[in-house]
């Protein structure tokens, strides 16, 4: 209201306090936290890295996420004298665990804007998203105090009772798996299922995407969420393909299910045979990008083919490539499953290599 004598605006102190509170609250709520996520240059297996950028008035759209930079000399991606590397945003997802948060997957670029040698995403040749990928990500919940999987039996109970099991004697870490699933779904990731695996403390989730790059993005974001979630429980996530060594326990893989228009529509066993045969002469090239220490897993035992051999067959889980029975029942219209990739492999590099081989087939 107005003071009629002084003819100047007059505000009650309560209005001023309320205005200050609302203004401050708006400024806080108008801030967004963008978590830039990238892969470092460590070998033989890259690690996830991330850092947070706080921005104002963010639209939530990928095109409004700015390029950023980081110290590549601290991640084995640059020398100290010229250490800046660039982060190019390629995918964005809401972060359900942080207020006004977003998870931003990025590619690493050199300072001149070219793709860094560690950038597997840039090697994918699938501009029209004709290739569809479904990755089956296995992992172990690892107890740092015992240096063993969560729930690993002291009496050396043999594997068998733990796969898709229920009960406190058989299933370990279900709460983490369930929370991870919920967070991934809330973030918009296309998780299609989860299950307990053959060993205690071993779990799996499956992600599918119509597009190779997006499938890789979602696997890496899901891995990031899982690593961060495990921090709450004081546990580590172990993606080593054979963390228990040369024992009678299954290792961890990341089976790659894939298709393109030809595989989805051809209706021809001959075409499937030709595509599978295209993989035979390039076993070495595939194994090179299918994950470190995979020789410990691909032994010919525990539902694997030997690392230096190649085979394919209908419903054959001991083959390099399995032809799913559903593909056959649908008249040879479906997909293939490469069972060789290890759980620690880079899905970008897996997809890039598979696409290159499929395109080379004489069909």
Model-derived regions: residue spans:
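Polybasic, lysine-rich low-complexity intrinsically disordered segments
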Residues: 7-8
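Residues marking helix boundaries in flexible regions
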Residues: 17-21
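Glycine-rich, acidic/polar active-site loops that bind/position phosphate-bearing ligands
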Residues: 26-363
């Amino acid at each position: 209201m107005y003071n009629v004598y002084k003819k100047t605006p007059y505000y009650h102190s309560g209005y001023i306090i309320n205005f200050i509170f609302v203004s401050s609250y708006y400024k806080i709520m108008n801030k967004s936290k963008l978590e830039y996520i990238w892969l470092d240059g460590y070998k033989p297996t890259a690690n996830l890295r991330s850092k947070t950028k706080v921005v104002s008035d963010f639209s939530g759209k990928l095109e409004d996420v700015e390029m950023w930079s980081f110290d590549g000399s601290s991640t084995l991606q640059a020398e100290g004298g010229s250490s800046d590397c660039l982060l190019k945003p390629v995918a964005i997802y809401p972060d359900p665990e942080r207020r006004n948060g977003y998870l931003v997957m990025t590619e690493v670029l050199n300072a001149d804007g070219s793709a860094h040698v560690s950038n597997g995403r840039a090697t994918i040749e699938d501009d029209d998203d004709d290739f569809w990928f479904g990755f089956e990500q296995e992992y172990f919940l690892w107890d740092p105090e015992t240096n063993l999987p969560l729930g690993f039996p002291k009496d050396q109970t043999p594997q068998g009772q733990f796969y898709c099991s229920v009960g406190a004697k058989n299933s370990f870490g279900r709460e983490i798996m369930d929370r991870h699933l919920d967070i991934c779904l809330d973030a918009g990731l296309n998780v299609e299922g989860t299950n307990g695996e053959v060993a205690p403390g071993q779990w799996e989730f499956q992600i599918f995407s119509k597009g190779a790059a997006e499938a890789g993005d979602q696997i890496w974001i899901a891995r990031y969420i899982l690593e961060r979630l495990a921090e709450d429980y004081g546990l580590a996530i172990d993606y080593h393909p054979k963390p228990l060594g040369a024992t009678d326990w299954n290792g961890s893989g990341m089976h790659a299910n894939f298709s393109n228009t030809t595989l989805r529509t051809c209706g021809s066993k001959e075409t499937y045979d030709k595509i599978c045969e295209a993989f035979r002469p390039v076993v070495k090239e595939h194994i090179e990008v299918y994950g470190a220490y995979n020789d410990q897993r691909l032994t010919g035992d525990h539902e694997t083919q030997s690392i230096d051999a190649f085979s394919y067959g209908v419903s054959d889980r001991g083959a390099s490539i399995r032809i799913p029975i559903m593909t056959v029942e649908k008249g040879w219209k479906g997909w293939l499953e490469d069972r060789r990739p290890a759980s620690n492999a880079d899905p970008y590099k897996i997809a890039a290599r598979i696409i290159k081989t499929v395109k080379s087939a004489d069909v």
